[in-house]
Amino acid sequence: MTQPPVRLLVVDDERNIRKNLRMLLEAAGYQVDVASDGEEALAKSREQHYEIAFVDIQMPKMGGLELLRYLRGLSTKTAVVILTAHGTVARAVEAMKLGAVDFLEKPFDPKAIRLLVDEILLRRRLGPGGSIDALLHLAELAWGRKAYVEARAYLKTALLRDLTRPEPYYWLGFLYESEGDVRQAAHYYYLALDANQTFRPARDALTRLGWIDSKRS
């Protein structure tokens, strides 16, 4: 039996943003509704379940924070991603405290939006008991949209599940290396080799960094 398409909602008072996000998400295979303000979005949410809603934080009639409070009052399980312009990031952080799952700053990176949708949907399918491979995939999706804090959290959760797998150590090393912390990167690459002496990616990374066993701390 064919699964119905995932429904998403885009809420923004700027027509071009609604149009561009809708086109981007529909091209990725999702069914997308749009609303120009919080009141319209709330009415749609009472009639239809949305897996994810992209909500502008600053709109006429009803802004993003007020909409988020109403959605939580409806006990809806819609994951809310806040859309914010420069200067409203502090309010986006407030929205996170109210239950928003993430926020995106304008202008948007199309790749980051697609990866975020994939990440949220995968996280929901997995629930609290996701496999290590699934957590590694979540980390990869988060890294792809430059959400390094979230990527690191997924990897550390994977380590809590199984300390003997080399991949979480390796990818933690990769994250630290991408942020310029070579010493911490090497530490995790060595931990990957401790878990599996034949794990070639970690050995190659240490060779690339110019580290040898005598430098291990």
Regions picked out by a protein language model, each given a short descriptive name:
Residues H49-F54:
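Active-site beta3 strand of CheY-like receiver
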Residues A43, L65-K77, L191:
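Short amphipathic alpha-helix used as the core "switch/output" element in two-component signaling
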Residues D37, G63-E66:
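Acidic catalytic/metal-coordinating carboxylates
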Residues M59:
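Receiver (REC) domain active-site loop signature in two-component systems and cognate sites
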Residues K19-A27:
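Charged docking surfaces used in two-component/phosphorelay signaling
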Residues F108-V117:
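C-terminal output helix
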Residues G29-S36, K44:
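Short hydrophobic/Thr-rich beta-strand motif most characteristic of the beta2 strand and flanking loop
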